[in-house]
Amino acid sequence: MDTTVMIEEHPQIKELIAKRPIVWQNPDYGKRADLPLTRADIFDAVARWERFAPFLAVAFPETAAMNGIIESPLLPLEQMKPAWEALNHQSLAGQLYLKADSQLPISGSIKSRGGIYEVLKFAEQVAMAHTDLTYMDDYSVLATAKYHELFAQYGVIVASTGNLALSVGIMAATFGFKTTVYMSHDARQWKKDKLRANGVTVEELNTDFSSVIPVARAAAAKDDHTHFVDDEGSRDLFLGYAVAGVRLQHQLKVQGIKMDAAHPVVVYLPAGVGGSPSGVAFGLKMIMGANIYPVFCEPTHVPSVTLGMMTKLNEKIAVQDIGLDGLTAADGLAVSRPSRLAGKVMRTLLLGTATFEDDDLYRYLTKLVDTEDVIVEPSAAAGFTAIAPIMAQFPTLAGKDVTHIVWATGGDMMPESERQLDYELGQKLLTKINNR
C-alpha cells in the first residue's frame, strides 16, 4: 500500500507510523446509519442468558450467588482518582469508575460475555435439534450425563491470543464438546496451561493472530459437527458482548449515577481485533443512546481499529501495511487487522480512539493495586491512558458532571507469579518517572 497517498488523505497516519500516541476523532460519529443488528437482537441475547442461568449456577458454583447470572461490578475509584491526577499532573473533575470485567466469573475477562454466550447458543441449538428440550425447561438439565454424551459428538474450535480461548475453551469443555483452541505466538503460557488443565486441545502456531484465524477456520470447515467461533465477524459473539449495555444501565441506576445531556458518561474500552469493545459499545449506544460516549484504546504498535476506521478500509488493512510491527505487551490487543464488524458497526457509534505506549499500562495497573487493591492484566489498564487525551480533545467531556468508566477487560485468572512481575515492572517505571 502507498503510505504517501494515505498520509495525504489522513495526516494522522504519519503519527501512527512514528508510534506516537494520538487521539483520532471519528468524523462520522452520531450520523444516521442502517445497522445490521437491533435492540431486539440484544434482548434475544438477554433472554438466552437468563434461560441458561440455572445451568450456569450448577456447572459453575461461583455463579450461584448471582443465580447463574454472569456480571461484573462497577467500582468507584475514589483512591485511584488522586493517583491518576498525580501521574497526569492535572485534575480529573468528574467521577472515575472501573467496570471490572477482570472479575467476571468462569474466565475472568470481558470474553466471558461473548465467548460463553456463543457456546451457550450452540449448545442450545444442538440440544433443541436432538432432544425434547423446550425453551421453558429448566436448563440445568443440560449439566446431566445424557446431554454431556450428546455434546461429546460435536466440536468447538476458536482462534485466540488468550482470553477468548479461555472463555470459549472452559465453557465448551464443560458441556462436553471436543474443544480445540488455535493460539498465536503472543499468547501467554499460563493461559495455555489453564486450557489444557480443562481438557482443551491447544494448537500453538508461531505466527500472529491474523494468520491463525484462517488455519482455525479451515480446520473447523472439515467437520459438519464442529462450530467455529469467529473472532473477526461472529454475530453471536457480538451480541453476547452487547448485553453489557442492558446490565450497565441497571448498575448506573442502582449506584445513582446520573446520565443525561448535562451528565455524560464516557466509557474507555481496550481494543484488539475490536470485536468485544464494538459489541459492548453497540449495546451501550442501543440501550442508553446519545449521552454515553464509547472510546477505544489501542497500543501505538497495534492501532488496528484506529487505522481501519480512519482509512475506512476496515479489515482490508493491517498495521504491517504502514510498517508497524504489531508487537505489544498487551497480549489481548496484539491483533494487527480489525474485525469485519468493528469498523462497519462502529462507523457512527464510536466517538473516537486513543493510542498509548505499553509502559503506561504497567504504571496504571501498579497504581490500581496500591490504591484500590484491584488486580488487572496489562491490557485491562488501557482505559486509564485515554482519559487525559480524550478530555483535551473534547473539553465538554472534562467537566465535573462527567462520569469516566474504565473497562477492565481481564486479569482475575492470572497466576500470582505473573501478577508480581507486572506489578514490579510498574513500580520500576513509576520510579523512573519520579526520578526525572
From Swiss-Prot:
It comes from the Bacteria. Keywords: Lyase, Pyridoxal phosphate. It is an enzyme of class 4 (lyase). It catalyses: D-serine = pyruvate + NH4(+). Its cofactor is pyridoxal 5'-phosphate. The modification N6-(pyridoxal phosphate)lysine is found at K111. GO terms for biological process: D-serine catabolic process; isoleucine biosynthetic process. Transmembrane segments: none annotated. GO terms for molecular function: D-serine ammonia-lyase activity; hydro-lyase activity; pyridoxal phosphate binding. Its EC number is 4.3.1.18. Gene3D superfamilies: 3.40.50.1100. HAMAP family: D_Ser_dehydrat (MF_01030). Belongs to the serine/threonine dehydratase family. DsdA subfamily. PANTHER family: D-SERINE DEHYDRATASE, THREONINE DEHYDRATASE, MITOCHONDRIAL-RELATED. This is Probable D-serine dehydratase. The lineage of its organism: Bacteria, Bacillati, Bacillota, Bacilli, Lactobacillales.
